[in-house]
Curated annotation (Swiss-Prot):
PROSITE patterns: KH_TYPE_1 (PS50084), S1 (PS50126). Mg(2+) binds at D486, D492. InterPro entries: ExoRNase_PH_dom1, ExoRNase_PH_dom2, ExoRNase_PH_dom2_sf, KH_dom, KH_dom_type_1, KH_dom_type_1_sf, NA-bd_OB-fold, PNPase. Its EC number is 2.7.7.8. The gene is pnp. This is Polyribonucleotide nucleotidyltransferase. It is found in: Cytoplasm. The keyword Magnesium applies. Residues 622-690 form the S1 motif domain. Gene3D superfamilies: GHMP Kinase, N-terminal domain (3.30.230.70), K Homology domain, type 1 (3.30.1370.10), Nucleic acid-binding proteins (2.40.50.140). GO terms for cellular component: cytosol.
Length: 704
């Protein structure tokens, strides 16, 4: 008999159930976690031995959504799930980020976490459920893991924090923040906000961390009941003698190398020092392990940089802790794009473009949570040349998808509504140089490019990356970190926002002991940096341009009676296709009768508007129109009277005398005056040539 072990607890307004012991018993650990009908099955498998020569920790996190979870069959040709969607990739990263720092530094065994969404309630996003499941499975597995962690989503509705808001509640929320951490420390924050203050953002982080303690307590209780024995794994003892010898040979030289401000020159010098030291030590003792020497050199290198910062000495590139690198801001640099900007901060540079399209250019996204249309796209590209390397060029990698999403979060709060600006907007950030915080450079460049394109954004936004070096109670917060400071520091803290508040916050912490005070210092320092960058950006462009590019489509909006939509579309789309070809415009019709006409030429748009007005104009009974014979039948002729309208002239209404044969009087394409005699309930028009040609008949109205 399979006997599951279950923990059930209340988590805000939801009930969470964690179950183990029933499924995937050959995995190292497996749990089924559910929150109000949203269920995620999470497995962990760890290899007992590391691969020989393994130099990094091979942790893989795969989050996958199954369409059966929502009672659907995939719409693809093969009717099965394919490559991960952007949403699945982002959630995989969301799980990876808080768990990765909790494995011991020298643990190099392969670990794979797979989270599969097997049931979904559209009101409950599976990402928090998957995070809880990954934490529970790792804690149960016995793998060396300094967890468990908890996870919470925090909303901000009516000036109150809301724990794990539903999908409907999030639509009313000014904040969507995910926080994960251990009992004593926040490890990861991912959020977007509607221009909230630093205090409100920090309050949300603290609130989420406090509330998730119930998750950690219940996972610990489950581990006590069902946890597997801890692995008999010990970190390799440090070779103190070799460490001292490496430090003696390399420390001073690395200190000098890290005074070289130019990145590539510094890297060349550091690589040369490492090669010299390794060669010298192996020459003295060829039994030494070159990989071990490299690991010790990396440790010495880290200590050199961190010690200088903690002593208050200038940073790698000579700056003080709160200084921003030199900025160069340019707009309108690409002549045929709709908007463009080149944003340079030190050795980080982004070429950003904005392109305007129509509603049919919007992205239709089919997710488990339901279908939606996205009319604002932001894509981030990180080619290998931006860091002076060669490499594969192709579809975006996980990192590019994640950085693009963060940059989009930073800009989203200031974007105009569809009613204010009915365009689909695509921003592309090409990172042409990178030495720290290219995602935040993308935020700055996106703001500039959107303004250059004439998009009426509510405010300019800028982003900044902060870092932290902490030893004991001594800590230093660094503004505008370099790539090396990110790699060698204890925290990566990215903040985007306008002059009035924060629009996005992302935080990844590698150590415990990050207090509210430290986060407060970092947020306040980031605000000063953000305002400085905004000041420089505003010198280049301070408000959106008054008009969009001459190469961008202009969208004109008109409204018709919804009952007339069928007339504009025509049978099988014949009328709207003819209109599009005739006027050279793009025409989109909504169910409420709103028509959007896009054209690069204003005269073409006006022509399309005039033709639609003709088609939708009410036919007046008793009025005489100039018509054209379009079809001849035995009992009469069909005559077009303009605006896509066509009526029947019965054989008895062609002439004053009896007509035996219609073709004796009318030919195809012949212009004839006709009088509207009747429009019946079905919209059919009865015409008369006889009545239109009487001596007292008025002059016909021209058909177009």
């Amino acid at each position: 008999m399979l006997t599951p072990i279950i923990r059930k607890f209340q988590y805000g307004q939801h009930t969470v159930t964690i179950e183990t012991g029933m499924m995937a018993r050959q995995a190292t650990a497996a749990v089924m976690v559910s929150m109000d009908d949203t269920a995620v099955f999470v497995t962990v498998v760890g290899q007992k031995k590391a691969k020989p020569g393994q130099s990094f920790f091979p942790l893989t996190v795969n989050y996958q959504e199954r369409t059966y979870a929502a009672g659907r069959i995939p719409g693809s040709f093969f009717r099965r799930e394919g490559r991960p969607s952007e949403g699945e990739t982002l959630t995989s990263r969301l799980i990876d980020r808080p768990i990765r720092p909790l494995f011991p530094d020298s643990f190099l065994n392969e670990v794979q976490v797979i989270a599969t969404v097997v049931s979904v309630n559209p009101q409950i996003n599976p990402d928090i459920v998957a995070l809880i499941g990954a934490s529970a499975a790792l804690s149960l597995s016995g793998i060396p893991f300094n967890g468990p962690i908890g996870a919470a989503r925090v909303g901000f509705i009516n000036d109150q924090y809301v724990l794990n808001p539903t999908t409907d509640e999030l639509k009313e929320s000014r904040l969507d923040l995910v926080v994960a951490g251990t009992a004593g420390a926040v490890l990861m924050v991912e959020s977007e906000a509607d221009i909230l203050s630093e205090e409100q953002m920090l309050g949300a982080v603290v609130f989420g961390h406090e509330q998730q303690q119930v998750v950690i307590e219940n996972i610990n209780a489950l581990v006590a009941e069902a946890g597997k024995p801890k692995w008999d794994w010990q970190a390799e003892p440090v070779n103190e003698a070799l460490h001292a010898r490496v430090a003696e040979l390399a420390e001073a030289r690395l200190g000098d190398a890290y005074r070289i401000t130019e990145k590539q020159e510094r890297y060349t010098q550091v690589d040369a020092i490492k090669a010299d030291v390794t060669e010298a030590l192996l020459a003295q003792d060829d039994t030494l392990d070159a990989a071990e020497i490299q690991d010790i050199l990396a440790s010495v290198e880290k200590n050199v940089v961190r010690s200088r910062v903690l002593r208050g000495e200038p940073r790698i590139d000579g700056r003080e802790k709160d200084m921003i690198r030199g900025l160069d801001v340019r707009t309108g640099i690409l002549p045929r794009t709709h908007g463009s900007a080149l944003f340079t901060r030190g050795e980080t540079q982004a070429l950003v473009t904005a392109t305007l399209g129509t509603a049919r250019d919007a992205q239709n996204i089919d997710e488990l949570m339901g279908e939606r249309t996205d009319s604002f796209l932001l894509h981030y590209n990180f080619p290998p040349y931006c860091v002076g390397e060669t490499g594969m060029v192709g579809s975006p990698k996980r990192r590019e998808i994640g950085h693009g999403r963060l940059a989009k979060r930073g800009v989203l709060a200031v974007m105009p509504s569809a009613s204010e600006f009915p365009y689909t907007i695509r921003v592309v950030s090409e990172i042409t140089e990178s030495n720290g915080s290219s995602s935040m450079a993308s935020v700055c460049g996106a703001s500039l490019a959107l303004m250059d394109a004439g998009v009426p954004i509510k405010a300019a936004v800028a982003g900044i990356a902060m870092g932290l070096v902490k030893e004991g109670d001594n800590f230093v917060v660094l503004s505008d970190i370099l790539g090396d400071e990110d790699h060698l520091g204890d925290m990566d803290f990215k903040v985007a926002g306008s002059r009035d508040g924060v629009t996005a916050l992302q935080m990844d912490i590698k150590i415990e002991g990050i207090t509210r005070e430290i986060m407060q210092v970092a947020l306040n320092q980031a605000k000063g940096a953000r305002l400085h960058i905004l000041g420089v950006m505003e010198q280049a462009i301070s408000t959106p341009r008054g008009d969009i590019s001459e190469f961008a489509p202009r969208i004109y909006t008109m409204k018709i009676n919804p009952e007339k939509i069928k007339d504009v579309i025509g049978k099988g789309g014949s009328v709207i296709r003819a209109l599009t070809d005739e006027t050279g415009t793009t025409i989109e019709i909504e169910d409420d009768g709103t028509i959007k006409i896009a054209a690069t030429d204003g005269d073409k748009a006006k022509h399309a508007i005039r033709r639609i007005e003709e088609i939708t104009a009410e036919i007046e009974v008793g009025r005489i129109y100039a018509g054209k014979v379009t079809r001849i039948v035995d009992f009469g002729a069909f005559v077009a009277i303009g605006g896509g309208k066509e009526g029947l002239v019965h054989i008895s209404q062609i002439a004053d005398k009896r007509v035996e044969k219609v073709t004796d009087y009318l030919q195809m394409g012949q212009d004839v005056p006709v009088k509207v005699m009747e429009v019946d309930r079905q919209g059919r028009i009865r015409l008369s040539i006889k009545e239109a040609t009487t001596p007292d008949a008025e002059a016909p109205e021209a058909a177009e």
